[in-house]
Amino acid sequence: MKNIYLNAGTISDVFNGLENSFSAILNSNYNEFKLNLNTNLTKGQIQGITFINGITAVQVEMTFFDDVMLSMESLGTSSIVFAYCDCDRFKHSFGSTGQHISIKKHHSALINSNRSINTVLHFYKNTTVQFSLIKVETGNIGKAVNDSLLFNLKKTFLNKQPNNCYEGLQNIKIAEKLKHFKTITEPGMVGHILKKDCIQSILEMEINDNTAALQKLSVSINRSAVKQINELKKMYNFIKPYTIGSVYQKVMHSKNKILIKSFLEEN
């Protein structure tokens, strides 16, 4: 197994670290990075782009010829990461000994943490994995260009739990948007803007998905509560006459016993 450790920093720092760790060739231009790998350990490509509002997107397509554990410094308490797997699988854990969450083909994951603990990705020998990452930094709200999007992401996804990794099926519309993102080839500022709009659209869909799920859960809970209340009312209405009748019978029975006893004593 090969263990690789990356320091936290800008996307440029991360790609420089990957270049050194994997003996790769890095090309960068206008906040875009392209890393080509062809060694005894890995073969493939990693591409990344960063936007002015604290959002970074990364696409990975790699074949591993050995097991690899890639450990990265803590994401930071204000970071949110969305992961989307398109081919095969990989695993995520907080720390090397933390719980392993498998992110499979056509599945996605939400990752955030409010503790200083490394984020670890686990890759397996003789597998070709394809996945996309979208990292959102919400710590600079107020200074960023698109405050409302970052604010809503922070409000919706930053969890108060120490470490959080949720995995589930991909949203089909988001998967289609990611495919479209990969087809954008316009150079320079035009391509940059098109890619930014596409990624922001994906993030808005993530917010809507989460909000809709919470609303459905709330409706379900409310319906369940109303149903239980109605059932209790039915039970009460069913039991009530029997309860009153039973009490009345006990009172009358006691009263009759007293009268009979008094009559016998007098005679």
Show which residues each predicted segment covers.
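Alpha-helical bundle regulatory/interaction domains
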Residues: 5, 93-222, 226, 236-237, ...
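Short hydrophobic beta-strand segments that form the core of ligand-binding sensory/regulatory domains
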Residues: 59-61, 81-85, 130-137
